[in-house]
């Protein structure tokens, strides 16, 4: 029993390996990060279609899935662009200051952040949240592999507590119109030429 007790996972063995226990192949951090980004593409496609579909429901329109996809892409592409530009700026800045190679980890972070944001969010908030998530959530801890928080969720949490009206609720997830325009009760008789007010009231009643 003593030998079994000593071989448990809480104790280390006194045996030493003669060769490296790791498999060395072409799959490095860059390859893994790119695969993660590529695996998120279906999520973006579905999200774009859903954004267009929700907008068509809001406006009471009948649209195809291709039209919904185009509408969604027109909405999320600016968000993605701002996210990647902000992330690349901070990654390059910290890489130059610390004199270390640029890591591809920010690609995954910048690919995840737009998936957590509503479609109608202001682009300046996207830039601020991305900067907060990468700088405070990752870079101050030393970069890729040393952060204790998820940078994408740090960006989401930052927006939730600083701009709750733009990040929470049901209305922010649909591209609703700012307002409706239509004739008012006073504009209808005002548009009549040579009309009698009494006759208009009698007609309306």
Residue spans of the language-model regions?
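Generic transmembrane alpha-helix motif of multi-pass integral membrane proteins
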Residues: 109-119, 136
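C-terminal ends of transmembrane helices
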Residues: 17-23, 87-99, 134-145
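Hydrophobic core segments of alpha-helical transmembrane domains in multi-pass membrane transport
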Residues: 36-49, 84-91, 115, 131-134, ...
């Amino acid at each position: 029993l003593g030998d079994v007790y000593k071989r448990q996972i809480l104790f280390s063995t006194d045996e030493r390996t003669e060769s490296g226990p790791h498999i060395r192949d072409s799959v490095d951090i860059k390859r893994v990060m790119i695969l993660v980004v590529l695996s998120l593409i279906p999520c973006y496609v579905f999200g774009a279609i859903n954004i267009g579909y929700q907008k068509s429901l809001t406006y009471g329109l009948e649209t195809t899935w291709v039209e919904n996809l185009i509408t969604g892409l027109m909405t999320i592409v600016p968000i993605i662009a701002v996210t990647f530009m902000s992330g690349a700026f901070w990654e390059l800045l910290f890489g130059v200051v610390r004199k270390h190679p640029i890591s591809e980890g920010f690609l995954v972070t910048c690919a995840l952040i737009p998936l957590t944001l509503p479609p109608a969010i202001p682009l300046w908030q996207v830039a601020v949240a991305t900067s907060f998530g990468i700088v405070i959530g990752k870079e101050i801890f030393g970069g890729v592999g040393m952060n204790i928080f998820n940078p994408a969720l740090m960006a989401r949490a930052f927006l939730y507590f600083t701009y709750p009206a733009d990040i929470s609720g049901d209305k922010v997830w649909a591209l609703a119109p700012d307002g409706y325009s239509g004739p008012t009760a006073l504009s209808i008789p005002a548009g009549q030429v040579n009309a009698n007010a009494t006759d208009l009231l009698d007609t309306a009643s």
